[in-house]
C-alpha cells in the first residue's frame, strides 16, 4: 500500500470518527451522568463492536449479511428496538433528581461495556461501512493491509473518545444539575436514531 493511500484512508477514518453520531452521544451521556470509568467501559465496548464487524467484513461475513435482506433487517430492527429501549430508559430516569453527592448505584465498567458493545453489534451499518470502505484502499492480493486499516480506524477512535470523556468530566458538575434536561435530550436522540435505523433504506 502506498503512503498516499494510507494517508487518504486515515483522513476518511478521522472524519468518520470526529463526526457526531450515536457513539458520541453514548460516550458523552455516560461520562456526564456516570463518570469517566463507566464512559471508558462504553468506549471499550464500542471498540470491540467495531472490531467484530471489521473482522466479519474482512472474512466476508458482512457481505453475506448484506446479501440476505431478512438477516440484515432482523439485525437492523433489533438495533432499532435497543436504541428505543435506551431512549425510554433515559426518559424514565429524567423523572428522578440527581446530585453530585447522590448515593445511587452507578453502572460499572462491565455494564457500560455491554451497552457500547450491543449498540454497535446491533447496527448493521457499521459492518456495511467496513465492507464498503476497506476494499477501496486495500491493495489487491494483500489482505493483511485490511488489519492495518482497521487498526488505524480503531486507534483514532480510542484517541478521540477519551478526549470527549475528559471534556465532559470538566462540565459534569454543572450538567448533573440539569440531569432531567440531559436525559430528555439524549432520550430524544436515541429514539430518533432508533426510528431512523428501523425505517432507513439499505
What would you call each of these model-derived segments?
Residues 7-12, 81-84, 114-117, 152-153, ...:
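Short alpha-helical transmembrane interface motifs in multi-pass membrane proteins
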Residues 45-52, 113-126, 183-186:
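Select subsegments of transmembrane alpha-helices in polytopic membrane proteins
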Residues 2-73, 132-152, 161:
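Juxtamembrane transmembrane-helix termini in multi-pass membrane transport proteins
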Residues 56-58, 122-130, 190-202:
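Hydrophobic alpha-helical transmembrane segments in multi-pass integral membrane proteins
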